[in-house]
Amino acid sequence: MKEVREAGIYEVMADEACFNLDDARRLIDLQACDWINIKLLKSGGLSEARRIANLCKDSGMKVSVGSMLESPHGVIASMKLAHEIAPHLVHDLDAGWWYPSTLLTYVDGKVSTP
């Protein structure tokens, strides 16, 4: 990842390379990426995800929140974290299409709750 980043052609986002706070520290220390994408399920929940997000912000690392086909309730938790840490950025918040739910509404690429 670092070699691609240093080539300077593209910004590099760490996604599957970051599962926890130690992974985030390593990526930041190595300057291996420009962004870290946090997923609540992958990181062990909201508390650890928030710790990763705060480390990224304190280190000047861009951070976004993604989802892994969570239920609508999981996406709502991810939405709250995304709004808390970087409301101006694009995040990847999608629920599985097979969940029949009125908890989330997607309009023009934006997710909201009723």
Where are these regions (language model features)?
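A polyampholytic, Gly/Pro-enriched intrinsically disordered region
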Residues: 34-40, 110-114
